[in-house]
């Protein structure tokens, strides 16, 4: 193997291991990557020597090594998601004239990482570092919508809190809301976090097509119901930004995403 193809194949092995819930056999890796077994064992040996793979001989399986953990930890220290998202969110806020935010899931809560305001900002209760129940803001709903059903059930086994009396209050209502998000391709909430404010959001996906973060626009909503006709326009703007960030982090949308 020459250096460049070998490097690409080695990285592909690491991605396969990272996508699995636990260690797997060399044969499984070879099948998934359509590689000869001899090539797979050679790659695994090199990765093991470098500390990126650990061989569990008793189980005849391979898992990620400590070097992979160290690399992941270094990635987090560099705050790459926030650094990549900041200029995109600034442009989004300027285009739509509303506050743009980046959020991530922490259990059943939505944590805001970034907030970019337009030149004439509106006062919001959400800010960087603020956590909210993930089932209320559009930012959280769009992430929950792309999680496995069993994961969502584990996060929400019973009834949950509301802030304004709006939003899902039971697992059944949440399932219905998330199904609508998946069908639509984006999430929307009206007054579930703060009265007289609404938001729309799209998901950012990682290289496995899993929800990584959300891009949202929040705006004051005090008008007749007819003003909702502008929401698809705002949703398209968030979709453009979320898709750009997905590409920049090396991600891809899941096959079912519209």
Segments the model singles out, each with a brief description of its role:
Residues 204-207:
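Sensor-regulatory modules in signal-transduction proteins
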Residues 1-83, 243-251:
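N-terminal helix-turn-helix
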Residues 58-158:
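Amphipathic alpha-helical effector-binding/dimerization core
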Residues 84-92, 155-201, 247-248:
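Short, basic/aromatic recognition patches
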Residues 3-7, 61, 65, 78, ...:
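Short, structured helix-loop boundary elements
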Residues 177, 184, 195-196, 212-258:
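Juxtadomain coupling helices with adjacent low-complexity linkers
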């Amino acid at each position: 193997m020459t250096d460049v193809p070998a490097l690409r194949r080695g990285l592909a092995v690491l991605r396969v291991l990272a996508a699995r819930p636990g260690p797997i056999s060399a044969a499984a890796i070879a099948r998934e990557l359509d590689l000869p077994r001899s090539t797979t064992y050679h790659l695994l040996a090199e990765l093991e020597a470098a500390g990126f793979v650990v061989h569990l001989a008793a189980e005849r399986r391979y898992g990620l090594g400590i070097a992979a953990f160290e690399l992941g930890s270094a990635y987090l220290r560099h705050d790459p998601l926030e650094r990549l998202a900041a200029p995109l969110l600034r442009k989004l806020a300027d285009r739509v004239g509303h506050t743009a935010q980046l959020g991530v899931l922490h259990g059943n809560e939505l944590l805001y990482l970034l907030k970019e305001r337009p030149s004439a900002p509106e006062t919001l209760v959400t800010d960087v570092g603020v956590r909210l129940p993930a089932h209320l803001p559009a930012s959280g709903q769009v992430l929950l919508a792309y999680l496995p059903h069993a994961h969502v059930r584990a996060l929400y086994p019973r009834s949950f809190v509301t802030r304004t009396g709006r939003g899902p209050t039971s697992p059944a209502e949440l399932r219905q809301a998330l199904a609508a998000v998946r069908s639509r391709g984006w999430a929307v909430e009206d007054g579930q976090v703060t009265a007289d404010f609404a938001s729309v959001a799209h998901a950012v996906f990682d290289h496995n097509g899993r929800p990584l973060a959300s891009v949202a626009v929040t705006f004051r909503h005090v008008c007749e119901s007819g003003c909702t006709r502008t929401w698809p326009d705002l949703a398209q703007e968030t979709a453009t930004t979320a898709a750009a960030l997905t590409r920049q982090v090396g991600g891809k949308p899941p096959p079912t995403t519209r």
